[in-house]
Amino acid sequence: MHEMGIAMQIVEIAGGAIPSGIENPSVAKVNIRVGKLTAVVPTSLTFCFNIATQDTPLAGAELVIEEVPVVARCKQCGHEWIITGPDFSCETCRAGEVDILSGRELDIVSIELKE
């Protein structure tokens, strides 16, 4: 389960982003974007995040996951579409050469501190 490793990295990065001048910081939310091609299971990541945040300033924080679809552009005709299945062929001209425009993201967008 690679979600635990990802959760631990999120905790490390988000924890490091908390300004040092704040006394007893507490994080309310961590907002992330996860592409479909990362093979991250959102429920598993949330479960692992809740474990990884114990005894940290992120304990009890909500993990908000925005799933990013796989978007491709055909190299032959330039058509762009959202890929929903295993077929990466262009839905317009059926060419097999595509550029992946999105779907590989795994980004921390923001953290929100409790007041």
Swiss-Prot record:
Keywords: Metal-binding, Nickel, Zinc. Zn(2+) binds at residues 74, 77, 90, 93. Pfam families: HypA. This is Hydrogenase maturation factor HypA. Involved in the maturation of [NiFe] hydrogenases. Required for nickel insertion into the metal center of the hydrogenase. InterPro entries: Hydgase_Ni_incorp_HypA/HybF_CS, HypA/HybF. It comes from Desulfosudis oleivorans (strain DSM 6200 / JCM 39069 / Hxd3) (Desulfococcus oleovorans). Ni(2+) binds at residue 2. Belongs to the HypA/HybF family. The gene is hypA. It comes from the Bacteria. One of its GO terms (biological process) is protein maturation.
